[in-house]
Amino acid sequence: SSRESPMKSISSHVLDGVRGSDAIDLRVSAYCLAASGERRKIAEVRTDMSGRLTIEVDTRDDDSETRYEFVFHGGEYFAEHALHELKSPIHETVIRLDLSKVEACCHVPIIMSPHTYSTWWSSSDR
């Protein structure tokens, strides 16, 4: 709608499934993906002391094909915490989001371990 704000929030709470704790200081890269194939980095952040992060994005110029991509650098995180001794081939977890139907905020929690991850969508926009 014309009153809809072009600024939207993407947030996550990352949990370390090996240690059963918040995934503190996990690197996450965020990209805007255009229908043309252009992939533009919009943020490089780390989770805070509670395993959380929030990225604000300006969707003013987005079309219906625009997507947002989160890259969770789990392999790097587990190697830094000496929890990657099983040599999992899963190095990054990628989540792509369509914000065209999201009014304000899209919250995507994720539980990660070296061999698996689980995620879901949590939003008041449902």
Regions found by a protein language model. Name each.
Residues 7-100, 107-109:
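Beta-strand-dominated extracellular/periplasmic modules and repeats
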Residues 102-126:
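Compositionally biased low-complexity segments at domain edges in trafficked proteins
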Residues 1-6:
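Short, Lys/Arg-enriched N-terminal segments with co-localized hydrophobic residues
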